[in-house]
UniProtKB/Swiss-Prot annotation:
Enzyme class: hydrolase
Signal peptide: 1-27
Species of provenance: Phocaeicola vulgatus (strain ATCC 8482 / DSM 1447 / JCM 5826 / CCUG 4940 / NBRC 14291 / NCTC 11154) (Bacteroides vulgatus)
Cofactor(s) the protein requires to work: NAD(+)
Entry function: Glycosidase.
Binding site for NAD(+): M77, R78, D99, W147, L148, H149, H150, E167, V168, N196, Y260
Entry's cofactor comment: Binds 1 NAD(+) per subunit. The NAD(+) cannot dissociate.
Top-rank taxon, per record: Bacteria
Protein name listed in UniProt: Glycosyl hydrolase family 109 protein 5
Amino acid sequence: MRTFKSLMISLCMGTTLCMCLPQTTTAQTVSSGDSWTWDKGTIVIDTPERPTGQKSVLGLTTPKMEVVRVGFVGLGMRGPGAVERFTYIPGTQIVALCDYEASRAEKCQDILKKASMPKAAIYSGEKGYEELCKRTDIDLVYIAADWLHHFPVAKCALENGKNVAIEVPSAMNLQECWDLINLSEKTRKHCMILENCCYDWFEMNTLNMAQQGVFGEVIRAQGAYIHNLSPFWDHYWKNGKEDKLGWRLDYNMKHRGDVYATHGLGPVAQALDIHRGDRITTLVAMDTKSVVGKDLVEKRTGEECKEFRNGDHTTTLLRTANGKVIEIQHNVMTPQPYNRLYQLTGSKGFANKYPVEGYALDAAQLTASGVQPKVDDLNSHGFLPQAEMEALVEKYQHPILKKYGEMAKEVGGHGGMDFIMDSRLVYCLQNGLPLDMDVYDLAEWCCLAELGAISMDNGCAAVAFPDFTRGEWNVTKGYKHAYASPEDENANMEKAKAFTAKLKEQGAKEWAKEAKKKKK
């Protein structure tokens, strides 16, 4: 038996780091050591047994919440947007705001004022989140902190009996994945990954098509995070004057693997029913050498960069128990258009989002899918003509988009998908339903960096993919979104709207009273 010193995973925050807390030794980014063995050329990592008294959280529900009381941790770049989105969701109350810098938390009070919501309690400092998590009037802790502190904040919240929603990546290594699984199973609280790309329009409509057999059996999928960050490297937070690289470039220099896999993997994993009738069994990763990365370091430091661990382009291949293949790519270095790929290959059809959105079906399959072709000799050698594509999308528009789509475009958040994600989270909590993404999704989507590093550091060897459900991946048949009955949904929404109306009345009075005091 050998022990591998594992690697960590980082978070892309777009252009700047959302610093909530300082980097400390308490925010571990590496597993303490994963035990593994070779088995017929495949690396097999030990799977910890489920502790006595715990049970699976597949399909986990919690009692209905008429009002979802929220505490936000991390108010740098992404956090304030989440606070604002929640002011548009009926039946929510923003109870507390936390950031390492008190000024950032205080600034978010302006968002509440604009929405006529009452002031929230403010927490700050390195351990401010611990006090927030101890409150008894919070149901959900929404974590948009820096990537080092996703896990410690989530751990604290779960240990204090709170449901948690965590920005991506939600866990930095295998140990953190297992710890979050154990905490969710032990506390019976939700632990959701905030993967917004699962709620983009093309992905949702295509998922609906796949679930209804439009593409036949989906046998292969691709996803990616390809985003040239050259304009942004100098905007990442730097730890003092001596730090010439910023956290992100320094991280990429020192660590290998797909460090931001969830945008690409999440949507295709849902389309392939991962841990809902199928599971990933094998991973193999390969990367290019670093050319751009090394050059970036040398230009900023004036010194030779002897090693840049993260390849300019990383490719990870995954095989499932049912013989499907997933390809995930990562590239933040080379000049090329933004691309998440999102491609599904089926036995009877094909879907592709980047760089060109389109569907490929022959006339017989399009007709069988309920859309009559308007052109003769339609085949699958090219994408559907515009009219046929629009008809297909209209027929298979996802019910969630029908419900939230227009409002999402008004509220915004990465084009609206953030608002849809938050709305679904609240909807499921208010109606006592399973969330759209569970803690096993979190683990499966976040572990690619460490597993990929293990593969590449051992000659691009195959790595047996852990079964995070511990044998229950085939219990649930097919990925599904949960819905309340129309009667319950309407009744709960009326209660939510009534609560929010009263809350806004209260908030307006409080802000008016404060304004009078300031005039005096």
